[in-house]
Amino acid sequence: MKSLFRNKKGYLKCIILLFIASVIIACDKYTVYHTFQPIPQKGWLRQDTLLFDVIVPDSQTYYKLSVEIRNRNNYPYQNLSLSICYDGPEINKLPADTLKATLANKEGIWQGDGWGGLYQSTFSIGSIKITKSGTYLFKVAYTLPDEILPGINDIGIKLER
């Protein structure tokens, strides 16, 4: 009975060690900010601009900005057009960038990673230069004519050094 208990303790220690190792490996020293905002199940309303408050610790640095889209099978289009802008301590709202994200190919096959009806795609916006540390507000809105846009599950942004 003692050897069985000892083995369980060993398994538990091994599981804890693997968990800690995976957390350490998963941490990316280059990622400054990475989060998603959920979209209601009924759809994304035209007037609902997504806001992301990003604390940027380093100034005089170029950052890579990416947008991540999680869509469901019921998204009715091949593409999603987004307007992305940001403002911060040293700037008043820069002109918006427009992203035309291709979510499905011409045959209707979803291009993102995923399964079970949920797919995630990542799109690079490019590099932005931050000249002053502080809090920056990133705004994301869709530019399609629909008043309610179904089939989008989450929108995320990622800022990397």
Give short role names for the model-derived ranges:
Residues E68-N71, K139-D146:
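Short beta-strand-plus-loop segments that form exposed binding edges in beta-rich domains
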Residues P76-L82, G151-N153:
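Short coil-to-beta strand junction motifs in C2/discoidin
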Residues L99-K129:
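An anionic, turn-rich surface loop/hairpin at beta-sheet edges
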Residues K2-I15:
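Bacterial N-terminal signal peptides that target proteins for export
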Residues V23-A26:
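C-terminal motif of bacterial Sec signal peptides marking the signal peptidase cleavage site
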Residues D28-T31:
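Bacterial signal peptide processing site
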Residues Q60-Y63, S124, T131-Y142:
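Short tyrosine-centred short linear motifs in exposed loops/low-complexity segments
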Residues D48-Y77:
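Post-signal-peptide N-terminal segment of Sec-exported extracytoplasmic proteins
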